[in-house]
């Protein structure tokens, strides 16, 4: 049974790593996209900071959804400023138990290109040819290892 609680006036589900989200300011981003009626629209939305997001996605990896591994890979691969800038975001909390636990889980799930993490990423991307699958698995492994080595 999922339990929720009221936090700052919002009913929120409890999630492993969710408490870390309150140690980082929410980020505001601008999203521009085409609506179903064809008009281009812009919205400014608040999103959780990257460190708690990665911690929560890592905690969720045991639920058997390939998207969790893909989301981690995507954030690392596309973080503005690269993996070094992303690693700097972890600096204030790198010694917290929850971060150490997340690193341990990432290390086990992404221990090689043949482990569950890279395989889940390739599966989620629904790639057809073996060469593309192997390239993505290798890139996933290398991206996660690069972050792990810098935290």
What is the predicted function of each stretch?
Residues 1-151:
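Compositionally biased terminal segments of proteins
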């Amino acid at each position: 049974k999922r339990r929720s609680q009221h936090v700052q006036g919002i009913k929120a589900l409890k999630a492993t790593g969710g408490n870390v989200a309150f140690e980082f300011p929410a980020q505001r981003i601008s999203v521009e996209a085409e609506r179903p009626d064809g008009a281009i629209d812009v919205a400014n939305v608040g999103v959780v900071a990257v460190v708690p997001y990665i911690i929560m996605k890592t905690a969720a990896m045991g639920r058997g959804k390939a998207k969790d591994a893909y989301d981690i890979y995507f954030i690392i691969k596309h973080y503005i400023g690269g993996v070094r800038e992303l690693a700097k975001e972890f600096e204030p909390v790198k010694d917290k138990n929850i971060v150490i636990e997340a690193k341990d889980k990432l290390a086990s799930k992404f221990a090689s290109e043949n482990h569950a993490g890279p395989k889940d990423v390739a599966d989620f991307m629904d790639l057809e040819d073996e060469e593309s699958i192997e390239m993505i698995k290798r890139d996933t492994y290398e991206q996660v290892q690069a972050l792990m080595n810098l935290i």
